[in-house]
Amino acid sequence: MKTSVQDFRKLVAQVGEIDQIMIDVEKAEGIYVWDTDKKRYMDMLSGICVGNVGHRNPKVVQAVKEQMDKYMHVMVYGEFVQSPQYRYIQRLKEFLPESLSQIFYVNSGSEAIEGALKAAKLFTKRSEIISCKASYHGSTLGAVSMLSQEEFTRGFRPLLPDCNKIGYNSFEDLEKITERTACVVAEAVAVGEGVKLPIEGWLQALRKRCNETGTVLIFDEIQTGFGRTGKLFAFEHFDGVVPDILCIAKGMGGGMPIGAFVGRDDIMQSLNNHHPLIGHASTFGGHPLGCVAALATLNCIIEDKLMADVERKGTRYRNELTHPLIKQVKGIGLFNCIELREDVDWQKALISCFSEGIITGTHLFNSQCLSLKPALIITDEQITESIERIKTALDKI
């Protein structure tokens, strides 16, 4: 049954503004999405880095089906022993630095950020939160308070007090981190304005400054995690840099909703020591279906060696996707963006891509950058086809 965009808008709040890219989804599999007119699209957005192992991955689907036959939700988070929660963190810890040893499950990346902020404040007994300019960490009031763009925050004031900003890659701004700073929230690879890599030594200097001031360093790996950059987590590319809290979601669940923050024992225990005993709470956090999906996703990434070819595949896009309207294709692994020339109408480019069967989207703070983040399972033949389709789309605007 088809649903018109107009009918959808009447009942579902805050939906997309460009009718031509609001496809009516029929099914999805691998890197493909089909609409109700049976048109097939190549997904270069992966649900914003959710579908790292592809849509409807058979191993993820089977794990969810098997768990559904046992039980689904039985109790709010943390009250019962649930093996899906334990088995997931037990497996994930095999690939994490030893210091990241305790997990708190939530439902989304925004909630992971919110929980991490609360843990950092409880642990340090400080109030200041520092984030990077032009960064986005979620839609809760705490996350919105970290935004630096007035147009995104003016309707939600008053925001949380004591939220300040530093420049990503600014060594000078690191001096703004002091003994009154509870935490710094940063991305190892920044995404808000288009994919941006840290300059040499900056992440190490950030880590050093946080150590000097007793500040909790929180890494947001909600988009970059789970093999997207060629490592399980982006921070692994940079020697000597380990966060105190790691926020994860999106690609974690292979298409199922789940998120978490993983941190040092002493920091995570501050949530338990809070009185009353609700340092953070979640009814559906650690949902068994989400946890088994996450475990199947992680096992798929590791056992099928999906990360081994990610950088080579990404390099193909960065080297082969050239066009007079493209300024550059930049990124790391399969975490890339197409930066259009300043005089190119990004809306026309976006609509033309969808017309040619390419799903993409713009970066939040830079509409001239189109996302290029297909599933890790994409084949060389599919890469070639997607490159040609994107070139054709740009030819037609």
Model-derived features: positions:
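Conserved N-terminal phosphate-binding loop of PLP-dependent enzymes in the Aspartate aminotransferase
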Residues: 1-397
